[in-house]
Amino acid sequence: MFTTGGTAVAAPAKTANACGPVMFVLPGYQDGGAFNLLKPELAPNGANPVRIPFPNAQQDINLYADVDAGVANLRTALYNLYVTSNCDLNTKVYIVGFSLGALVAGTVLETEPPGRNIQGVLFSDGRRQSGESNWPGDPGGLIGKLPVPGPGGAGLRPLDGFKYPTLTVCNGPRSAGGADGICFLGSVADLNGYFTSHPFYTFDVGAELRAHGEGPYPNNLRNRVIP
């Protein structure tokens, strides 16, 4: 408010900026997946890849605290985008996470307020849902099977838990290295996939979205076992 001639007058509303697409990247433990996820040529629609820092080095062994720190840092990045940089709420935002980073990204995709133009992509989410899947009898992710809450929460993610369209990708039993037991735990043998399958995604976000489509999706979820 300001005054003119003794009369209070409302200040004109600040016009939001039209900002280009951005891709917030949360890599896995010891930066797994970060190299390709941060390549601009693999980002969708010319989005600018921005790494969200969080504790994920070898010495960072408190996974619960690590995920919480990542969630806080990602929310800060979103605040800076919409408030500090005054970007329009229609600015295209991709939130992409792999493994430990998928737990971070998925938590924010479940809780971020509505009304924004966000697309999620999760590689090897340990809480991956078993429903809405292209794989009959899909068992879902490892952390969803733990008897106590794991980092990122307890149980498999709710079928309709995401607030924004989210593509979740997991290497299944027919992939070259077998099932990735982090996101597809059908048996104890699938745990071997942490070494033979888990590190070997393309991390080509643009190609994955071209292959499987961007949202909207039913229940904001497109759940894909590869191949």
Whereabouts are the PLM-identified features?
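Secretory targeting and sorting signals
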Residues: 1-11
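Small-side-chain structural scaffolding
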Residues: 8-10, 70, 102-105, 124-126
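Surface cap/lid and interfacial helix-loop subdomains adjacent to catalytic sites
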Residues: 14-61, 65-88, 111-227
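Gly/Ala-rich beta-loop-alpha elbow adjacent to hydrolase catalytic centers
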Residues: 93-109
